[in-house]
A protein has these predicted regions:
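Short acidic/polar hinge/loop motifs at secondary-structure boundaries
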Residues: 107-134
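Periplasmic-side early beta-strands and strand-to-turn transitions of outer-membrane beta-barrels
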Residues: 139, 151, 158-160, 164-166, ...
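Gram-negative outer-membrane beta-barrel transporters
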Residues: 332, 372-379, 464-466, 483-561, ...
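Non-catalytic regulatory/gating segments with a bias toward low-complexity or hydrophobic composition
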Residues: 57, 69, 130-131, 150-152, ...
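N-terminal periplasmic "start-of-domain" segments of outer-membrane beta-barrel proteins
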Residues: 27-60, 88
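Outer-membrane beta-barrel signature, preferentially recognizing the C-terminal barrel domain
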Residues: 25, 258-277, 315-318, 390, ...
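Extracytoplasmic beta-strand/coil segments of soluble accessory domains associated
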Residues: 66, 70-106, 110
Length: 627
């Protein structure tokens, strides 16, 4: 599908005039849609932006969304084991629930239930590109966009057919196929499907998370299907419809319920999404209207009794979204505005909502964004008001200014507010819910420089984020939630990219001081320092790559040891680690490419969640056929 945010050639020409010269003069000024909900060149966006293409995903030979995101600036990924195990994404030191995860511009369903998005359940075979914006974006998108926005796009961008087959360590095997074909001059049909299975490994071998030791393999299986059709009615109107879904089964290590003789260590997730829309594009004006529906069923159960058996747990959620957006070119910039409506609902039969008085909430948001250029200065501003069916109106705003003070060098500064709405669980569940909760709020300052020095294109950013009204539960029964927490996060980020001879270098460094605003303790599972480096080069027809990732020291809790002195679980420290991956690819023919990868080359033993192992050294071999 073409983007519902599409602009005309005239519109893109205006934004090209606004583009930062250091970036605009390159051959890779990519077009994105996620920063302000319309198409614009990356170089015209004042916030730090990273775009990951399908070609890069294939080059890195990643096998999960988590593996892709861990390479990006400002991202920490904590995962309770290997592929398919529960994962959390931290951006710029904010909590996982403060990162907005979108799939094709629509908020991931489960975020409205648990508060954060578990990216381990999204099949990478569906992902065609990822747009990642750092900093506050609630003034554009509403709730969740505190630390940043990650938009996962599933649309195949080229005609043709691709077949892939991969085998690897721990019994890993994956098969996927995708095709895009034209029917006549105005209709395009796209289809994709995949199957993934891995035996996995014992993610909790030491039994030191408070549960019963389970010496077993914790495997994962995924099946996914994607179908879409787009039709160009005339030169101005496009319509599209699509449907996609996936089924996942995950084995994990769990706590034993001795009273009921239940060990619920298997997760089965079903997700179905249907959406459609229409877009209009003429001259300086464009508009879109779309509707999306998602139903997700998430079971946790003891395989001895079956998915619907004794003491099984079900989270059954429904999400609907309607979006209407408009964009018009004005002077040396543009103005955009729109309305979106969403409903999140917990369906009958869900385990944690048996005593709830209410099982849904609605949210309506109205937003306005603008960007203008005046010589070497670009200014942008956004404002948005959200009406929540429970707590009423909440307004956020942000502004950024960039000044190109010398050819190829720009200084940027900005301020923004953001918020996170209470989730369905926090408001209405049978345990600890509080219908009087207010949104968590954030105030953020950011400043930096970017430029091009010789072959190096770089950006240096410093930021501060004060978060208040954090929702926390009582430490004793009835464990009710209240707005009592605070956090202060300060950080510095440097990113760079350059070519030398046959080598292409991409690297980032981040320093984060993320602390509890009241106790001043460091926030858990966030590394103080990270260094990420990607080296790619070609020799003859070989395409070679080296990935280096240094993850600094982090804190966590030992949930197997309760310390009465602090009335909580024992704090622990996890040391830093250096990780290397190597990749190679060779085109056997014009259609067939063979790829190989060694992950964690030096077989480092480390954890991103205390008590849960990582995979160790792994080997993968892929065959890819295009026609």
């Amino acid at each position: 599908m073409t983007s519902p945010y599409a602009l005309s050639v005239v519109g893109l020409a205006v934004f090209s005039a606004l583009s930062f010269s250091a970036s605009a003069n390159t051959n890779d000024d990519q077009i994105i849609v996620s920063a302000n909900r319309f198409q614009q060149p990356v170089s015209s966006v004042l916030a730090p932006v990273t775009v990951v293409t399908r070609e890069e995903i294939d080059k890195w030979q990643s096998n999960s969304v988590a593996d892709v995101l861990r390479r990006l600036p400002g991202v920490d990924v904590a995962q309770s084991g290997g592929i398919g195990q529960t994962s959390s994404v931290f951006v710029r030191g904010t909590d996982a629930r403060h990162v907005m995860i979108l799939v094709d511009g629509v908020r991931l369903n489960q975020a409205n239930v648990s508060g954060s998005s578990d990216i381990s359940q999204i099949p990478l075979s569906m992902v065609q590109s990822i747009e990642y914006i750092r900093g506050p974006r609630s003034a554009v998108y509403g709730s969740d966009a505190v630390g940043g926005v990650i938009n996962i796009l599933t649309e195949r961008k080229t005609e043709g057919t691709t077949l892939n087959a991969t085998m690897g360590s721990h019994g890993y095997q994956e098969y996927d196929a995708s095709t895009q074909q034209k029917i006549g001059d105005r209709t395009t049909i796209t289809a994709a499907g995949s199957y993934l299975y891995t035996k996995g490994f014992d993610v909790e071998a030491n039994g030191n998370t408070g549960g019963v030791r389970q010496p077993d393999r914790d495997g994962f299986m995924n099946k996914s299907l994607w179908l879409g059709v787009k039709h160009q009615i005339n030169d101005n109107f496009d319509v599209y419809a699509r449907a996609y879904g996936f089924d996942n089964r995950t084995a994990y290590d769990a706590f034993y319920d001795s009273y009921n003789d239940v060990l619920a260590d298997t997760r089965q997730l079903y997700s179905r999404t249907y959406d459609g829309g229409i877009s209009y594009n003429r001259g300086i004006y464009s508009s879109f209207l779309n509707y999306s529906y998602n139903r997700t069923k998430d079971y946790n159960y003891d395989p001895r009794y079956g998915q619907y058996g004794k003491e099984h747990r079900l989270t059954d959620t429904e999400q609907q979204n309607v979006q209407w957006g408009n964009h018009v070119q004005v002077g040396n910039g543009s103005v955009s505005g729109g309305v979106d409506w969403s409903r999140q609902k917990m369906m009958d039969g869900s385990s944690d909502f048996t005593t709830a008085d209410k099982n849904y909430f609605d949210n309506t948001g109205v937003y306005l964004t603008g960007q203008q250029g005046l010589g070497p200065v670009i200014a942008e501003a956004s404002i948005r008001s959200d009406h929540h069916s429970d707590y009423g109106w909440h307004t956020t705003w942000q502004t950024n200014v960039g000044w190109e003070f010398a050819d190829g060098y720009r200084v940027i500064g900005g301020y923004g507010t953001a918020f996170k709405a209470p989730t369905l669980n926090q408001l209405y569940s049978a345990w600890g819910s509080n219908p009087n909760l207010k949104p968590e709020t954030s105030k953020q300052w950011e400043g930096g420089f970017e430029g091009i020095t010789g072959p190096l294109e770089w950006r240096l950013t410093t930021y501060r984020n004060d978060i208040e009204e954090l929702i926390q539960s009582e430490s004793s029964y009835p464990y009710q939630n209240y707005n009592v927490g605070e956090a202060r996060i300060e950080g510095v980020e440097f990113t760079g990219e350059m070519d030398t001879w046959i080598f292409h270098h991409t690297f980032s460094y981040q320093y984060i001081d993320a602390r509890n605003g009241k106790t001043h303790e460091r926030l858990e599972r966030r590394a103080r320092q990270q260094l990420k480096y990607q080296l790619d080069w070609n020799i003859e027809e070989w395409d070679l790559g080296l990935t280096y990732n240094y993850i600094g020291q982090r804190t966590d809790k030992d949930y197997g040891t309760f310390d009465p002195a602090i009335n909580g679980y024992k704090p622990v420290s996890m040391g830093g680690v250096s990780l290397f991956d190597v990749t190679a690819a060779y085109p056997v023919t014009d259609h067939l490419t063979i790829r190989g990868k060694v992950a964690n080359l030096f077989d480092k033993d480390y954890e991103t969640v205390y008590g849960y192992r990582t995979a160790g050294r792994e080997y993968f071999l892929t065959g890819s056929y295009n026609f």
